[in-house]
Regions:
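Conserved alpha-helical scaffold segments that buttress catalytic/binding sites
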Residues: 2-168
Length: 168
């Protein structure tokens, strides 16, 4: 079996309900048992609330950078990073980090939404609805210099017909 670095990201990034962190807390011990690894818990849950993308980006900056750092550390050590997170904003730092280490990687984005909004196109202001666009460099989150080339991304399960995501 591949050596796995299992990380449970418990910090709030753009959660609008308590469900995402509860999901991480429920899955982490189960995945850890299955992999024979104790998950490393990062952060503590914040109070879920509705905030604009720029507020969430500012408030979750440390968690997002830590998520990218966990991927960096795992790949540098020759380990497979497995991150459990409650929502998509972590893609802002994790996906570009993976592509820096493994440029031949193809991202399979399995989501009901494309998450390809930008600050200029979002109708809801939800940071998670902008995650893939930010990772691909369609807008600058100010977190990481590298971006994911759009031709390295495959969308699957997008239920909105490929239109920009509307989260609400």
């Amino acid at each position: 079996m591949t050596d796995v670095a299992l990380v449970a990201l418990r910090c709030r990034t753009s959660d609008r309900t308590a469900g995402p962190v509860r999901g991480v807390d429920a899955l982490a011990p189960l995945v850890g048992k299955r992999l024979g690894r104790e998950p490393r818990a990062i952060g503590s849950p914040g109070e879920p609330h509705v905030a604009r993308w720029d507020e969430d980006l500012r408030d979750s900056r440390g968690c997002l950078l830590e998520a990218g750092g966990q991927v960096e550390d795992a790949l540098t050590a020759g380990r497979l990073p497995v991150l459990l997170a409650g929502e998509c904003s972590i893609a802002l730092t994790t996906l570009p980090t993976v592509l820096r280490h493994r440029p031949d990687t193809v991202v399979l984005w399995l989501d009901a939404h494309g998450d390809f909004n930008t600050p200029g196109t979002t109708e809801t202001g939800n940071l998670s609805g902008m995650a893939l666009a930010g990772a691909c460099g369609a807008w600058d989150a100010g977190l990481i210099a590298e971006t994911v080339p759009e031709d390295r991304v495959v969308l699957a399960g997008v239920g909105d017909g490929g239109k920009l995501q509307v989260v609400g």
